[in-house]
């Protein structure tokens, strides 16, 4: 689960099916490999020829003299089983299968599926690609049939060759360049986009990740990877398949929770590429300068929720209120007005609209604006027939779309720093045992869930909230307003309740909404509850429930809170504390706990001097992804925290990092060791192979605890003031025990038998 794929930049590449035949896949790919300055070694494998492209070729993998780290397989699917077995035998860690899958016969697809099925447990990482395949421009690697991409900072994961071609064209126009292109054939590839998202997130050369949504892979794992990546760099999710109104609402909800930018059309994708590539330049207000009347542009801006501001203090004619400075301004005059606007304190961003002219004035203005764009720190959007570069467009509407994308992304980043308020005191938690007693008695089931009265809804309700199971994303709660459809996803938090109340105008019903979402966290874990509808009419709020005892379980896109119930633990001094998972609604208590710690202890825990957690740190600590993170807390009967421990993914594949704090009153009482045991167990369940942390050399108590728990302590390779603690989480193998007493006991038992 926590493995990253082999890097797509090999040192020694084996090309199986390399060819000189015209119009063949092997010929096209070998040409692409040889025309770029690839610094690695290329070895062709061809059954019939001793040389290919002037290079020595081998008849099969068994005859290769040198070890290789990637095999590029260009032969038909009928060869896959034999080739993959040979890769396993030769210890080649990564096999990339490239085909024009759209042109293959059904039997060839079946052969590919069967070969992949047989090799699913092998140690060979298999990636199935469409003809655009893999490109790493900075390394000169192009394993596909498409033109070489310019080097840059955008990592691309596409699911079809046509998407790769479109994204390549958009990249060429926008100009940010590509760090890595991965063209996966989504229906077949065992190595999925989530694997490569993890890789690109850790890649320092990649500053933006643009990924085409893969509906074929596990959605929980996919959006967990996107969420981790979006904490480090911008992520664009391009939705190439048809998404109906409900799925769009779900993807918007995922965007709010994970922090990625969704795009549902090619135009939205192009605008988002510009916006996210210039993500450090954001603004709320947009001024405009134009050499043509632009009043109609405000109509388009209104649809996007943008207000265009005219040039400040420019003495423009009152009849041209939208930045029109005349139809034939000299280029220097246009530039002077634009620079004056950018230097004005009220200007946050400027849109320069340059209409075609009979002479070369428009081209000259565009060049001047391009140079000015490089010199200013404020966003300068350029619309011109001569546009070519980042934040440059051929139509003003495209620039408006990019400006909107910047604002949306800024809002998404701010949402990632929000924390949930504590649960309201009036909430009641349903009992799963009571729910399971009444699957057929719907009125009683509504009572067990603390829902409004079970009753047939009115014909024209004031609002309708619908809970149901999406085939791809699991449990979803929808709210339909006259403007759009909203969705929120479990585990539901008070942040979701507030979002629903605010966006759907349900302030009068906020108590009902809070209880509903709290109850639905329980209902989401009960498969036979397939649907719940809550509506409000003149007679009050009612609920309707649909059940199906035979319903199949659909995994929710977000992992639920740990199923392990809260338990009590007795300290050495006899005090009893409650141990439970940390929830998003614990943010306020978490902050109070950090504030209560002595200054020195806060420093040893966070390795910085702070009085409290920043909003970003607090949100990061409390808004956990329980598919790859975990946290537990210890609290007294009155809710006072005595300790907290957490873990999350590290940069090293298969490794997680931990952190722990205990209040002074609980130190030396066995609590820290117990909390560590809880998160170690959860990390094992999530599939991690190692748990680690860097501990200050001046913190002997933490080093002693780590040693007691089995962590190996070594000096940190990064900082002499730190020690690195690492615990192997892998289950011990069944090896003979080197223990005289144990062995003697086993011999006696054997003799008695």
Predicted segments, located by residue:
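Catalytic-core regions of core metabolic enzymes
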Residues: 1-544, 551
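Long, contiguous binding/interaction regions
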Residues: 548-753
């Amino acid at each position: 689960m926590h493995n990253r794929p082999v890097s797509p930049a090999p040192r020694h590449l084996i090309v199986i099916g390399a060819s000189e035949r015209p119009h063949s896949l092997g010929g096209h790919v070998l040409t692409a490999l040889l025309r770029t300055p690839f610094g690695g070694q290329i070895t062709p494998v061809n059954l019939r020829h001793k040389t290919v492209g002037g290079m020595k070729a081998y008849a099969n993998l068994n005859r290769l003299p040198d070890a290789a780290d990637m095999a590029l397989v260009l032969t038909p699917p009928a060869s896959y089983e034999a080739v993959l077995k040979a890769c396993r035998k030769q210890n080649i860690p990564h096999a990339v299968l490239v085909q024009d899958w759209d042109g293959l016969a059904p039997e060839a697809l079946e052969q590919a599926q069967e070969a992949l099925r047989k090799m699913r447990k092998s140690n060979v990482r298999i990636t199935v690609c469409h003809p655009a395949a893999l490109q790493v421009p900075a390394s000169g690697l192009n394993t596909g049939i498409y033109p070489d991409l310019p080097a840059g900072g955008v990592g691309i994961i596409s699911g079809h060759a046509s998407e790769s071609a479109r994204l390549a064209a958009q990249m060429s126009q926008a100009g940010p360049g590509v760090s890595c292109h991965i063209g996966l054939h989504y229906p077949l590839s065992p190595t999925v986009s989530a694997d490569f998202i993890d890789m690109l997130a850790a890649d320092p050369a990649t500053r933006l990740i643009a990924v085409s949504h893969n509906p074929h892979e596990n959605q929980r794992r996919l959006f967990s990877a996107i969420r981790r990546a979006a904490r480090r760099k911008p992520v664009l999710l391009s939705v190439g398949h048809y998404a109906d109104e409900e799925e769009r609402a779900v993807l918007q909800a995922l965007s709010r929770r994970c922090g990625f930018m969704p795009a549902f059309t090619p135009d939205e994708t192009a605008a988002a590429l510009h916006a996210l590539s210039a993500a450090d330049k954001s603004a709320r207000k947009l001024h405009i300068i134009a050499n043509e009347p632009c009043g109609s542009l405000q109509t388009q801006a209104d649809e996007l929720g943008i207000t265009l501001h005219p040039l400040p203090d420019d003495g423009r004619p009152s009849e041209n209120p939208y930045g029109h400075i005349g139809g034939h301004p000299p280029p220097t005059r246009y530039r002077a007005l634009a620079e004056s606007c950018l230097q004005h304190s009220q200007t946050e961003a400027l849109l320069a609209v340059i209409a075609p002219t009979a002479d070369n004035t428009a081209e000259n203005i565009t060049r001047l604006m391009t140079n000015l764009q490089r010199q200013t720190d404020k966003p300068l959007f350029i619309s011109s027939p001569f546009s070519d570069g980042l934040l440059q467009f051929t139509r003003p509407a495209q620039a408006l779309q990019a400006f909107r994308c910047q604002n949306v992304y800024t809002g998404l980043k701010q949402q990632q720093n929000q924390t949930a308020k504590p649960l309201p005191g009036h909430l009641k938690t349903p009992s799963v045992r009571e729910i399971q007693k009444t699957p057929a008695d719907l009125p009683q089931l509504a009572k067990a869930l603390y829902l409004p009265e079970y009753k047939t809804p009115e014909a024209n309700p004031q609002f309708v909230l619908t809970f149901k199971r999406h085939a791809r994303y699991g449990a979803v709660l929808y709210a339909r307003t006259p403007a759009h459809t909203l969705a929120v996803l479990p585990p539901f938090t008070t942040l979701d309740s507030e979002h629903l109340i605010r966006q759907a105008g349900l302030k009068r019903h906020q108590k009902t909404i809070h209880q509903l979402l709290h109850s639905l966290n329980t209902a989401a874990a009960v498969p036979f509850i397939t649907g719940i509808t809550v509506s409000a009419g003149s007679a009050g709020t009612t609920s309707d429930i649909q059940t199906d005892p035979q319903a199949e379980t659909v995994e929710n896109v977000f992992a639920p809170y740990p199923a392990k119930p809260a338990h009590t633990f007795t300290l050495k001094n006899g005090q009893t504390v409650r141990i439970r998972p940390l929830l998003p609604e614990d943010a306020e208590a978490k902050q109070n706990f950090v504030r209560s710690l002595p200054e020195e202890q806060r420093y040893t825990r966070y390795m910085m001097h702070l009085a409290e957690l920043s909003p970003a740190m607090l949100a990061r600590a409390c808004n956990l992804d329980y598919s790859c993170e975990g946290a537990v807390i210890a609290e007294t009967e009155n809710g006072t925290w005595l300790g907290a421990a957490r873990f999350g993914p590290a940069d090293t594949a298969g490794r997680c990092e931990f952190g722990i704090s205990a209040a002074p009153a609980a130190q030396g009482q066995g609590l820290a060791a117990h909390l560590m045991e809880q998160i170690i167990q959860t990390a094992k369940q999530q599939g991690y192979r190692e748990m680690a942390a860097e501990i200050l050399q001046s913190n002997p108590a933490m080093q002693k605890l780590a040693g007691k728990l089995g962590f190996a302590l070594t000096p940190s390779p990064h900082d002499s003031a730190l020690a690195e603690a690492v615990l192997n989480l892998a289950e011990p193998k069944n090896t003979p025990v080197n223990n005289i007493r144990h062995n003697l006991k086993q011999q006696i038992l054997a003799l008695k038998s």
